[in-house]
């Protein structure tokens, strides 16, 4: 009886874990046949809504690899950023509202990726400390101006370190450890976490074979999309 109860509970928990999830094809149908999947993407300067001035640089420096690993050709972000800077565009909000087709004519890219940094907070609670990072991603077709993929991803990373058992020492250690935190791995982590939901691109060995992967949070998809209308 007890074993049956435990088994039933396990099934319920598994089913609950699947609630609110969609397959990649259900969530992003325009990334699968008969639609034409984008091959290349240009990343515009990040929109920074956080209080961390260096957040855009951290995110931009870690964006290329996860999207390239997922099968897309990403135009070199440093070169693209310099081109925008020469035109006086330093922030993504300056580009919002412009037709995506301009990126096709100017860069030859099939898609444009908009990135919004919603949160980059360092939190201290006596002996505990963490960094919370929340990013929204929206991929738009430069041919149709339609949203192909959108996602909102947030992570919380503990920066306190191990306890020594001495409260005063631990308080000082937590402050120092958090102040010296290397944020590059955190930026990589949030980008990689979001890309899990992105359908594989042309250069990935499993392209068009991931449509039934049920890994897309409906809530995260809609929150990401909402950034384009704010």
Question: At which residue positions do the language-model features occur?
Answer:
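Solvent-exposed coil/turn segments that connect beta secondary-structure elements
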Residues: 46-48, 72, 79-80, 117-120, ...
């Amino acid at each position: 009886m007890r074993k049956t109860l435990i088994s039933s509970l396990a099934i319920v928990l598994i089913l609950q874990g699947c609630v609110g999830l969609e397959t990649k094809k259900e969530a992003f149908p325009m990334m699968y046949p008969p639609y034409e999947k984008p091959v290349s993407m240009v990343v515009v300067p990040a929109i920074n809504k956080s209080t961390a001035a260096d957040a855009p640089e951290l995110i931009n420096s870690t964006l290329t690899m996860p999207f390239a690993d997922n099968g897309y050709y990403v135009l070199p972000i440093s070169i693209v950023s310099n081109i925008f800077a020469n035109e006086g565009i330093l922030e993504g909000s300056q580009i919002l509202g412009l037709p995506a087709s301009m990126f096709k004519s100017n860069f030859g890219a099939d898609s444009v990726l908009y990135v919004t940094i919603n949160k980059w907070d360092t939190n201290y609670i006596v002996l505990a400390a963490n960094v919370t990072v929340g990013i929204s991603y929206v991929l738009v077709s430069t041919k149709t101006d339609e949203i192909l993929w959108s996602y909102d991803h947030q992570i919380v990373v503990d920066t306190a370190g191990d306890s020594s058992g001495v409260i005063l020492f631990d308080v000082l250690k937590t402050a120092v450890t958090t102040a010296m935190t290397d944020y590059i791995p955190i930026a990589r982590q949030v980008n990689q976490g979001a890309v899990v939901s992105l359908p594989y691109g042309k250069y990935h060995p499993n392209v068009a074979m991931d449509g039934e992967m049920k890994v897309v949070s409906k809530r995260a998809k809609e929150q990401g999309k909402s950034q384009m209308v704010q």
